[in-house]
Amino acid sequence: MPRKIRTRLDKAAVVQAAVEILNAEGLQALTLSRLAEELGIQTPSLYNHVDGLAGLQQDLAILNAKLLADRLSTAAMGKSGAELFMEAAQAFRAYVKEYPGLYMSTLRSSGVQEVMDKELQQEEERTMNVGLVVMASLGQKGEDAIHGLRAFRSMVHGFATLEVAGGFGLPQDCDESFRRLVQALVAGLQK
């Protein structure tokens, strides 16, 4: 549904409208024409704010990386060991549930892009650094920390995306299932 009150448009407002479409309707719904409709403008006017669909996707990737890094950094403050691991996992899961479309639309690492975006790379490094602190607090260093971080990301990603998609139909509490999953990974990493 198009916005009734037209506010002054800028890049941030355009990107935020795209996030709203992604989270409400999914990746397949985000087109420039759908975004223009949401904003109550003509599609060509979007080019005043974003560099086409590819530019918008890059802006979304940067926003996703920043929001996730912020969420993980906040969760990590003042914690260590298994408590830090659990808090970071819960923060990551909550983020995926709050921004499912944005999260799913930007899964590729900047490291696989032909042309590196410095801002995206910085935000991804910030997330990685928080992750490495989480791993170090469990005694994981070097390559072991990278493997542990991949296990952490895969665990949270898999659980949270299944949860968002309605993949857990049984009546048992998902929070308890997640807590047990996280505890199992912590136990494995501490061996």
Question: What is each PLM-predicted segment?
Answer:
Residues 1-25, 33-34, 38, 55-58:
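Basic, helix-initiating cap at the start of DNA-binding domains
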Residues 14-22, 30, 64, 68, ...:
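Short hydrophobic clusters on alpha-helical segments that form packing/core surfaces
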Residues 22, 31-32, 53-64, 103, ...:
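Amphipathic alpha-helical segments enriched in hydrophobic/aromatic and basic residues
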Residues 39-50:
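Short hydrophobic/aromatic patch on the recognition helix
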Residues 73-101, 124-126, 142, 152:
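Hydrophobic alpha-helical connector segments
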Residues 97-115, 161-169:
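Amphipathic alpha-helical segments used for helix-helix packing
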Residues 113-139, 146-150, 175-187:
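Amphipathic alpha-helical packing segments from all-alpha helical-bundle domains
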Residues 154-171, 186-191:
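Amphipathic C-terminal alpha-helical segment
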